[in-house]
Structures are given as structure tokens and as C-alpha cells.
Amino acid sequence: MNSFLEPYKDSYLLKILIAIAVFLFSLVTNAQIDRNTDLYKTLKAKDSIIFQRAFNKCELEKLEPIIAENFEFYHDLAGIQNRKEFMLAMKNNICGNPGRITRQLVAASLEVFPLKNNGVLYGAIQKGKHTFQEKNNTEIKTVGIADFTDLWILENNSWKLKRVLSYNHKPYKG
């Protein structure tokens, strides 16, 4: 069976059009913002509040103001949680045994993609990888790694975490 492009297989114009299409696609797929922008730095700081302060140190009062009222958390192992369920799980599970499990951002993996409506910034997608450490007595061992994707929405000039996908959890083999 012949491809519909068979008559054009030797066409110079077709090769140019394909090259242009590949170039344009690469621009779109690499549209993350520079790490020196205010948006990148702001959302990296928000990530730090979520994990360094709330997850690692159990300062949950730092977390509540940045979580949207209609927040949803999707976890590949623990299921779906709304805002109330997520905060309760943080309190009872993560902070129920403080210092046992901690999270570290894989800094080089963090990417931020702005979301705009007619040129006006309304949100951003933040994604990356993180590792999880377990503390036994004085030994700290990296035990897991996972991917995350966060949807941030700008509400009244304040960034709110609206959706989180936490997935690809697996044992760390580093």
C-alpha cells in the first residue's frame, strides 16, 4: 500500500515544509520560560512552601493560603483528594510521623510554562521530578522518585494551586 505522499517523495518543497513544521513544533514543545524570570522564581518559591515548609517541616499553616478552594490532587497510588481531604492527609499521614519522610526537588527538572488568554497571564503549569528520603535514626536514605505537574491559577494577584498530578512513583535507583 502506497502512502498518500508517495507522489511527492522526491519533492524539495515537501522536504522544506516538513523541516519548517518540525522547527515550529520544537518551538512550541520547548516553550518553558527562562529560570531567571519572575514567574519561574515565584512558582519555585511556592514549591518550596509546599514541600520544604509544609511537607518536610509540617508547617501546614503555610500551605492553606496557597491552595485553591476547588483544589484537586491526583495521586497514582493514593487516588483523588479534594482540598479538605488533602489537608487532612497531610496532617495525619505526612505530619503524623514528622521527619520520617522528606521530599527534595530535583532542581534541574523544574519547568514552568505560562498560560495566557489573549496575551494576559492567568496561570502556569509547573512540572518536575522529586525524590523522597526516609530517616531511620541518624541515617537518611533516598527511597523514591516521582514526577509532578501542578496547575497554578492567578486569582486576585495571588497564585493558587488548583490541580496537582503526582505520578510515576517508583523506588529510587540512583
Task: Describe each PLM feature range.
Residues 143-172:
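Short beta-strand edge/turn micro-motifs at domain boundaries
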Residues 67, 130-132, 165-168:
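Short beta-strand segments enriched in hydrophobic/aromatic residues
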Residues 32-34, 137-143, 171-174:
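A short acidic/glycine-rich loop-to-helix N-cap element
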Residues 40-41, 59-129, 142:
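A solvent-exposed, acidic/Ser-Thr-rich amphipathic alpha-helical stretch
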Residues 1-37:
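Bacterial Sec-dependent N-terminal signal peptides
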Residues 130-136, 152:
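Beta-strand elements of well-folded, non-transmembrane domains
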Residues 21, 29-69:
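Short, low-complexity N-terminal intrinsically disordered segments enriched in polar/charged residues
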